Amino acid sequence: MSTNPFDDDNGAFFVLVNDEDQHSLWPVFADIPAGWRVVHGEASRAACLDYVEKNWTDLRPKSLRDAMVED
């Protein structure tokens, strides 16, 4: 049985962010999807998870946060 590359504790990852400030761990061997950009890495899965935990503190999409400020 093969390991899911997104769950590989020994893999190398990037942290990606989209225009809504949503974060994703992404294996370095995979193409970066349209609409996403690298903000951290190449690093271990643990280091990337640490980055996400420290930097993605508000899970609401950016458009929702912006709309709530305008009201």
Swiss-Prot record:
InterPro entries: MbtH-like_dom (IPR005153), MbtH-like_sf (IPR038020), MLP_fam (IPR037407). SMART domains: MbtH. It comes from the Bacteria. It holds the Pfam family MbtH. Could be involved in mycobactin synthesis. PANTHER family: ENTEROBACTIN BIOSYNTHESIS PROTEIN YBDZ (PTHR38444:SF1). This is Protein MbtH. It comes from Mycobacterium tuberculosis (strain ATCC 25618 / H37Rv). The gene is mbtH.
